[in-house]
Structure formats: C-alpha cells, structure tokens
Amino acid sequence: MNKWFKSGAPWVWLSAAGVSISLISVLGLLWLIASRGLSYFWPADIYQFDMTDEQGKNLTVIGEIYDRESIPVSQLVHLDLAIDKSAKTIERLLIKTGNRELVSLDFRWILVPQITQTTLPEDIVVIERRTNGNFYGYIEQIVLDGKAVEESKMDELLERVSDFQAEIAELQTADIGAINYQIERTRLQVRKHQLDDTLTPELALMLKEKVAGLQAEYQVLERALMALREKVARDQIIMRAMDGQRVTINFEDIIKVSFNNKLSFFGKLQMFISQIAAFVSDDPREANTEGGVFPAIFGTVLMVLLMTVIVSPLGVVAAIYLHEYAGNNALTKLLRIAVINLAGVPSIVYGVFGLGFFVYMVGGSLDQLFYAETLPSPTFGTPGVMWSAITLAILTLPVVIVSTEEGLSRIPSAMRHGSLALGATKAETLWRIILPIASPAIMTGIILAIARAAGEVAPLMLVGVVKMAPNLPLDGNFPFLHLDRKFMHLGFHIYDVGFQSPNVEAARPLVYATALLLVSIIVALNMTAVSIRNRLREKYRMLEH
C-alpha cells in the first residue's frame, strides 16, 4: 500500500475523479438550461378540459399544460371530491389559460379528479398578441372593413398587417426618430451659442428656420403614420373564449395565429425555428416577460467588446512595464501584490467605485466642460455604456496583467540577448520578438477577461444597465456610437425576469432561454479568441525552441 501511494497513482486517480465530477456537473447544468430553455420555443399542444368545480358546476378550461405536481390528500379534505380513500396524493395540473383581459391571472391549477374529459380539438387557436399575452379559443368571425370574410383569408390579412407594422416601425424609429434627434441637437446648439454669447440675429433666424423645416417634415410623417395605423386598425377577428364570451381582437395587436393541434412534427419544428429567430431578433414586450431579447444581446456584446478594447492595451502595457522595465525592488513587489489583491475584490465594490468616480466625478466634469448646454440634464454624468465598459475593464485588468506576465516570463532570455547582440534596440526586441511570442498568453488573459465580464451583473446595475432601454447605443444618428446611453444586458435581464416579473410562472421558461443564450454568446466569444490564440501559438512555436 505504501509503495502504491509513493508511486503517485492515487493522486492521478484523485485528479481524474475531480476532473470527471467537474465535467459532469458542467454538462449537467448545460443540459438543464438547454432542455428547459428550448422547451420555451416548442409549440405546445392545447387541451380542452371539461371539468366540475368545487360547487359542482360544469366548466371548460382551455390551455397548455405547464407543470404537474402531486399534493397530499390531507390538503383537500375541505373539498367535496370523489377521491380514492386509499390514495395518499393527488395530481394537479398547472394550465396556462391566457386571455388576461378576461381573468386576473393567465395560469390556474386544476385537480385531475375534477376533470371529466380531456380533448385536443384541432380548431383551437393560439393568438400571440402584443399586449395581454396569448389568447386561446375558437374563431367565430373575421372582419375586414366591417365585412365578414372567410377564414382562409387569415394568412393574407396577417401578412398585410405585418407589412404595415414594419412600415410603422420604420417611420417611428428611422424617420421620425431622426427628425426628433435633429430638433433636439438644434435646440442644444442654440443653447450653446447663448451660453457663449455668440448667438447673432442671423444665426438665430437660420436655426429657427431649420427647426421650422424639421417640424414641417415631422407633421408630414405624423400624418403618414396615422394613416398606416388606421389601415391596420380596421381589421378584426372575433373569438370565442373558454367561458363562451365573444372577444374582439384587432389585427394590429396580433403577432401570430397558429393551430398548434393541427401541426405535424415538421410543422412544429418549423415554428420552433421561427420562434427562436424571433426571440433573438425582436424587442421585449409586457415588462420583459414576452417578446425577444435583441437589445439585451446587442448591449451585452457591445459592452464586452468595448471592455476588451480598453483592458487589452492597459493590461499588456502594465505587464510589460512590470516584467521588462521595472526593477526588482520593494515598489515592484508592492505593485504585484496590489494587482493580485485586486482580483479578489467583490465586483459590487467596482460598481460603487465606477459610480462615484467615473460617473459622478469624471462624467460630471465632462458635462461642465463640454456639455454645459444640456445641464442640468446630464450627458456623461449619468450611468452609461462607456462607464460600464471602463468599470469592467478595471475589474478584469488583474487577469490580463497576470496572464501576460506569465507569458513574458516563459520566453528564454537567450532570445532577448541574441536580438540585442544583433543590434536591435530594446524597443525593437520587445515589439518584434517578445510580444509576438507572448501573444498566446495575452490572448489567454483576454479570453478570461471576456468570460468574467460577460457574466457580471452587480456592478452594471450601478453604472449603466437598465430594465428597458428606449434606444440602442448604436444607431443612424451622428456620432452613431452613443457611449452616454444606457443599455440592456442579458445577465440583468435574467435577474429582472426571474425575480422582478409580475408573472413568475410565465417568466420561468424565459429565464432558462435567456440563460442559454448568454452561455452561447460567452462560448462563441471565447471560441473566437481561442482560435486566434491557437493560430498565434502555432505561428510562433518554432521561435520558442
């Protein structure tokens, strides 16, 4: 036994067991997130339950089965139910009934013993709406310009409404949004000239005429927008809900109409793919509990890229100074200790520092120096995407410094001496020999920085992230990239939907879907950086020997 321990074999097996447990845990977590997240997009079967309630009344419940659970019979002694006395538990179903304008909650529990009949009618319709969630029921009538039309016209009407909605969105965001932006810029220009005492009568008249012209364009676009909305609002669909009520739904509020129970496997697969595409390309709705997450995807990727651009040169330059130029003295040792300790500081502390120093001090000073015309409304003196990127750059700076130093220390000193002996300066040696060989280690530091920054939420809540951003940081208005704007983030979106949602049951699958998307983005960013690192490593492998 002693000989076996001395051979080192137990430690090899122990290490292998640790790696296996870690790998199984990671794969299990990914499987859990993927299975529950992807189920959010699969078209569910819509059931009709004929049942008897506690008062003995017959009623019908239409919806999709969201969850099942067993409860003790002892909790139901107050109900007059025909229950098998030998049973200890009873199954109950959580049904998503939708129709939020008719009932206060779009979920309800029903007991299996109360169900008298369960069917899957093929003519049940699921209507995905912009407000009030899904509607489940039967089509009674389709009205076009006040006249009833055949049900076969449904797809044609939906396509027409979709085209109108696209035109409305284009008018609102691109045309009307651009005019509003120019009017605001002109107002600030007038204010700036007033503060500088350079507003001449001629300049004031010119700016006034410019605003008048923009307002005239705005009126034309506003009339066109109203005309489009009138075209969209004239078509309606009359539905019959599960309680027999007739409900009129305007086509302008409809996103999609589907007969889930009629769909074949390939039909459901096609809808599954289309719903994933809509999830990653649409804006959120209904307090982030429905719709897509495109603004959050855009904000996450943009913030990570800005952070990478900031932290890469800072970390590499700091590592080069500490390893190549700084002497081995007490100050250098103190700096290394400080860098290592920074990696252990809680992320929320960085958020507080970013809010107090960058936002209030630096941003407030920038506003007073360069944006006085906007005061008291702050420009950079408020949380935004730039301060978020800088704060996370400081948070991940120790990772890049340590990784780069490790790469520099592995380069043989003979290569430095040989370069200097051939007449190269220290700067030329550093630029042409040292940095190319150390580039894989630099990329490793950047990979670790991206992985940590993409998942951080706590500091971002203080320095720039919001629940709903009205505008993206990147648009068609000069200067195109607006670093002062707030942004959405997938990590914060998960927290907001999971813990701040008014409808927890509806938001639960969305939490898993968003988490799966965040993991996918982080993996994609890391794999891109890893591929670059591997190419650099192969390119300079021969120089290391």
Predicted segments with their positions:
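Membrane-interfacial helix termini and adjacent extracytoplasmic/periplasmic loops
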Residues: 271-291, 350-394, 464-466, 473-481
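C-terminal transmembrane helix and the adjacent membrane-cytosol boundary/short C-terminal tail
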Residues: 326, 405-413, 420, 447, ...
